[in-house]
Amino acid sequence: KAYPQLELRFDVEDRLVDLVNEGVDLDIRIGDDIAPNLIARKLATNYRILCASPEFIAQHGAPKHLTDLSALPCLVIKERDHPFGVWQLRNKEGPHAIKVTGPLSSNHGEIVHQWCLDGQGIALR
């Protein structure tokens, strides 16, 4: 409202955008893959948690240890710059790379979120 002449177009992409050639003035990225020729500022820290529906927990039980995740159906989000199905987790012993699998995966977080709510598996959100 303070700038009524300003026009805004909000595009969501799962790819690296060529800011100059595509005429982009502002780019918000998730991750650490910032090209050295860009001026960047950290906006927030993205904390993640493991999620499952009450129905899923009732059927499969809750994992007691991070390694239990490998034997449970997990919902994998395909992220641009991360190995598929490898969750980087941390507990009191430190960081762990846990390989997970499951019947459903997507590159769209909201779809995985809905699957999780529907009791289809454990999600990292």
What is the role of each PLM region?
Residues 17, 21, 33-125:
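C-terminal regulatory
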